[in-house]
């Protein structure tokens, strides 16, 4: 619930003004059009009429997403997994929310099952529910690393709070609670086991900040000087990316943090809301890519159908998402 609420709250206008913040670096000038950014539709299986690419592994080997099969007027969800030009379709009601895939082709997602949110994993052709602690009323996955460790969070109805969760790859069928600041939610897990997420500043506080938990247990907060709130939405390599604002429902500014220093840099508003970050620190927004030397808009909008939505990016800069015309078309962007 926490991650979904943060993502929804972050979805504000792309042209929000970004004031300079005390103690915060402001990115350089915007220089559009410096890159040859190309759009490539992804193939859909026979009988699947709509599709969205929502996840890609850092190497670009696998892309995962959601399709729709219409049978006798009934729209049925389909889990889609691309490997190059080949696409695998899995008809399942669990394909409501596909949030991650790693370089081994393990896909993770969430679905509403028997009156509660439940996480799942697709691996080696099998869909399985992930275990959840007995004290949570719903659970969500948010990130997976190269070896298959999965992180997310659970909602504890009794205390109206959230706890960060990890499903370790080396202990299949188990789930463990991650020690975090109050009301914690894990958003990403790096290949070395570092976990990144969000939590309240303190118990009872209305302000949020990001956090980084190293494998040894050390926890560092990710904040933006001069702002009461900061939320991490993605992390990879030595970088985290997210958003900052004075009010959870107010204007937002996209931010990049260096995980080694915790330094925050407010970047061009064209990438708000932030969707992903590469190991090299490139930020993906809903409709644009931010590099240190400028911003590149993502092509794909056509007259009457202006919507393109990117969701994830590889470490080599290939982004995936979808375009909207009379149907949803899964796509990838290269050279952006």
Segments and roles (model prediction):
Residues 1-28:
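Secretory targeting and sorting signals
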Residues 2-5, 26-336:
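Residue-level hotspots at or immediately adjacent to binding/recognition sites across diverse folds
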């Amino acid at each position: 619930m926490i991650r979904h609420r943060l993502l929804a709250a972050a979805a504000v206008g792309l042209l929000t003004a970004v004031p300079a913040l005390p103690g915060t670096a402001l990115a350089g000038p915007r220089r559009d059009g410096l890159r040859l950014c190309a759009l490539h539709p992804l193939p859909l299986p026979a009988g699947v009429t709509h599709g969205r690419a929502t996840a890609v592994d850092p190497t670009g080997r696998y892309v995962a997403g959601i399709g729709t099969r219409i049978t006798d007027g009934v729209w049925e969800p389909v889990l889609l997994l691309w490997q190059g030009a080949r696409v695998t379709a899995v008809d399942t009601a669990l394909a409501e929310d596909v949030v991650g895939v790693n370089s081994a082709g393990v896909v993770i997602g969430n679905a509403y099952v028997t009156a509660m949110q439940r996480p799942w994993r697709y691996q080696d052709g099998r869909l399985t529910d992930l275990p959840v602690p007995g004290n949570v009323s719903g659970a969500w996955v948010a990130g997976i690393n190269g070896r298959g460790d999965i992180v997310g969070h659970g909602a504890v109805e009794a205390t109206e709070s959230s706890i960060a969760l990890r499903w370790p790859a080396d202990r299949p069928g188990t789930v463990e609670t991650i020690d975090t600041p109050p009301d914690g939610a894990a958003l990403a897990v790096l290949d070395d086991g570092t976990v990144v997420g969000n939590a309240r500043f303190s118990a009872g506080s209305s302000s949020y900040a990001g956090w980084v938990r190293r494998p040894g247990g050390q926890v560092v907060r990710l904040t933006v000087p001069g702002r009461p709130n900061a939320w991490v939405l993605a992390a990879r390599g030595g970088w985290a990316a997210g958003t900052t604002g004075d009010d959870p429902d107010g204007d937002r500014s996209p931010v990049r943090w260096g995980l080694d220093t915790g330094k925050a840099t407010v970047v061009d508003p064209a990438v708000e809301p932030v969707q992903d970050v590469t190991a090299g620190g490139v930020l993906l927004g809903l409709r644009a890519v931010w590099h240190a030397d400028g911003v590149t808009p993502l092509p794909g909008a056509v007259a009457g159908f202006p919507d393109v939505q990117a969701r994830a990016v590889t470490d080599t800069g290939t982004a995936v998402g979808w375009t909207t015309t009379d149907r949803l078309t899964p796509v990838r962007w290269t050279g952006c």
